[in-house]
């Protein structure tokens, strides 16, 4: 999440208390809109190393409290939502086959909340100036996303030793329909193999892929053995993708 209840304790610790999961380790992972895919990859690493047997990954945002409602360039894009997945071991041959993660911190100013950390402390003046809200260079983020989304999935496919024509379904971060269309074209996927629910919720950042995954699963979009790709990109600038064989 990039919208925790408070700086400390972490949102994960608040959730752990509410769930009564008192024996579970808990921490926040912040990679903005890439966060859920980062979380899945991190959880899978714990599972494959034998450290943990089950890991709960949650993406949750209240972005309506972090947008300036006078800025039509951002306030109409973002939404509130939450989604989760329990990651555990699956039979051999299934599960995550390839991953890709990356970041380019030099592009951080293209999508940021300038005040509220320790570099620029939030106060009445900075709230009045709108510095505690999301600031976005739309054209720059669009160029980054179009370049990155398809490329990161191709890298995950390569690491999974899969060909592009073996991909059965794609769950992209729900930020912009033009970005999703562009990624689908680069992956040579018809839109019926790409899940889109952007029109329902807007951009829910770290919750986006989690919500889309749940809805696609409930709608019966996957069958056992399907090769499914997930991809996210976001503030940082960050990106991540994975390809798994559905179980």
Residue ranges of predicted features:
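Short acidic, glycine/serine/threonine-rich loops at helix termini
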Residues: 8-10, 67-71, 239-243
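Conserved active-site "lid/cap" helical segment
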Residues: 116-168, 179-187, 212, 216, ...
């Amino acid at each position: 999440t990039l919208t925790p209840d408070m700086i400390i304790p972490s949102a994960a610790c608040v959730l752990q208390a509410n769930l009564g999961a008192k024996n579970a380790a808990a921490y926040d992972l912040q990679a903005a809109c890439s966060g859920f895919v980062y979380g899945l990859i991190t959880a899978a690493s714990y599972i494959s190393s034998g450290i943990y047997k089950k890991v709960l990954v949650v993406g949750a945002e209240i972005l309506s409290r972090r947008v300036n409602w006078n800025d039509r360039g951002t306030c109409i894009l973002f939404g509130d939502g939450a989604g989760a997945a329990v990651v555990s071991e699956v039979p051999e041959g299934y599960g995550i086959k390839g991953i890709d993660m990356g970041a380019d911190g030099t592009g951080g100013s293209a999508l940021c909340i300038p005040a509220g950390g320790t570099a620029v402390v939030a106060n009445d003046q900075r709230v009045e100036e709108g510095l505690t809200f999301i600031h976005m260079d739309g054209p720059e983020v669009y160029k980054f996303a179009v370049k990155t989304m398809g490329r990161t999935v191709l890298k995950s496919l390569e690491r999974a030793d899969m060909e592009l024509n073996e991909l059965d379904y794609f769950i992209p971060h729900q930020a912009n329909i033009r970005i999703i269309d562009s990624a689908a074209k680069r992956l040579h996927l018809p839109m019926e193999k790409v899940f889109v629910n952007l029109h329902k919720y807007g951009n829910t950042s770290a919750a986006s892929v989690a919500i889309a995954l749940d809805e696609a699963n409930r709608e019966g979009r996957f069958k056992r053995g399907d090769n499914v790709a997930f991809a996210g990109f976001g503030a940082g600038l960050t990106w991540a993708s994975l390809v798994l064989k559905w179980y």
